[in-house]
Amino acid sequence: EIFYNYNNKTELFGDIYQKSKEETAMVQLIVGKKGKGKTKQLLDKVNGAIKAAEGNIVYLDKSSKHMYELNNKVRLIDVSGYPIKNADEFIGFVCGIVSQDHDLQEMYLDSFLKNAKLEGKDITDALHQLKEISEAYKINFVLSVSMDKEEIPAEFQDDIIIAL
């Protein structure tokens, strides 16, 4: 339990915040081939989430092109500026972000295959790792993945929230 003292009132916030974070901890997928509108869906979702967010929101992208389409409360990180060579390094990069922000509630990963260096490769291990991170740190991940619904591994079919 975490108590905060504010204006001589001691209030319990920790349990309430932790409970609401636990309810949202998951990995969600927006899928569809390149050019189908996944990024627009992701931007709409992140900007809509700002109103209800109790913690911080991070948006990872392959460039800073969408900077002005994001609410200024969302932290945009241009992944192309970092020397990431493979999926393991990308997951390490995500863990680094998680470790530096204890109030992180949601991460939006645009161009997931490109940023995670998984184009043309199996995404199963990376999705499992993101699920583990999500459960361990109570962070909701929303990914845009340039694959058709049928190409997504069977065990992650239930995580698809939008198929274009």
Walk through the language-model features, giving the residues of each.
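Short amphipathic alpha-helical segments, especially helix-boundary/capping motifs
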Residues: 23, 67-72, 103-108
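Short loop/turn elements that form and flank the Walker-type P-loop nucleotide-binding site
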Residues: 53-54, 70-72, 101-103, 136-138
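Compositionally biased, low-structure terminal segments
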Residues: 4, 14, 90-91, 142
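Sequence-level detector for tyrosine residue identity
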Residues: 4-8, 17, 59, 68, ...
